[in-house]
Amino acid sequence: MNIALKLTLGALAAVPLTCAAQAPKLNCTKDMSYSAEFLEKFPNASAACNEVIEANGQKWVRFNAVVKSREDHHLTVKFIDSHHNAVATMTFSFDPTARVTLDDHQQKAAASLEEGDKLLIWMPESRIGLYAKPDPSQGKHFTLLSDDTNKQEEE
């Protein structure tokens, strides 16, 4: 095979890889549609968003959070924006078998979380629910008990 043909075939093979690498990054405010019900419970959602991806045929938003405390099956976390500022503090209850994803992508039982653990929390655009991964079959729901954001600001 001559050199020109090899170069042409190599360039054509690289085109799909180049296009995939240049797929537009989804934006937290432009590309996510938060429902009114969700925004009522999580008014700082847009500010707390760190990433939006498409997985399993739907958009998922990623929130970063730091564990403030865990007592029994109640978890209080600070949601952190992309500039590392706390934008909300909320308390959730969780199923005893629930698992979470740490910022190093390791899985950990929610019941084993400690103060300072950094979490990656996912939510699908189509419904309210917090998940360890962008896949509803892989995660357990966490139930919002209280939005402590204003209470924390007063302290």
Tell me the role of every PLM-derived stretch.
Residues 1-9:
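Bacterial N-terminal signal peptides that target proteins for export
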Residues 10-20:
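Hydrophobic h-region of N-terminal signal peptides that target proteins for export
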Residues 21-91, 103-155:
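Short, flexible, surface-exposed loop segments at domain boundaries
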